[in-house]
Each structure stands twice: as C-alpha cells, then as structure tokens.
Curated annotation (Swiss-Prot):
It comes from the Archaea. Disulfide bonds: none annotated. Contains a N-terminal zinc-binding domain and a C-terminal NGN-binding domain. Pfam families: Spt4. Heterodimer composed of Spt4 and Spt5. PANTHER family: TRANSCRIPTION ELONGATION FACTOR SPT4. InterPro entries: RPABC4/Spt4 (IPR029040), Spt4/RpoE2_Znf (IPR022800), Spt4_arch (IPR007178), Spt4_dom_sf (IPR038589). The lineage of its organism: Archaea, Methanobacteriati, Methanobacteriota, Thermococci, Thermococcales. Zn(2+) binds at residues 6, 9, 18, 21. Stimulates transcription elongation. GO terms for biological process: regulation of DNA-templated transcription. The keyword Metal-binding applies. This is Transcription elongation factor Spt4.
Amino acid sequence: MSEKACRHCHYITSEDRCPVCGSRDLSEEWFDLVIIVDVENSEIAKKIGAKVPGKYAIRVR
C-alpha cells in the first residue's frame, strides 16, 4: 500500500482518509518529508502547522 499525503494538512498516511484532519483529498504525488516528534517544541512543526507527531510532506501536488 502506497503512502499518500493530505492536500490540506500534508500529513502522510497509508489510509483512505487523513487521520489528522479527516480529509479524503489525498495525493500520491508528494515530495520531501519531515518527521515531527515533539510538536510543542519544534520550530519546524510550528512553521508547517503540524498539530500531531508524524510524517509530513513538504510539497503535495
């Protein structure tokens, strides 16, 4: 099963629906990723708007 990125929050998942925002608007065309471990203390998480720990795509088509 391929991983898809949510077009709204950029969370990467293998499910048919984004577990973070609930969107079904997912794409298999995403580029670069960042793994967020500590959402509250991560400057990158704040910059990309990450709400939960996990893998996030930098660019999603």
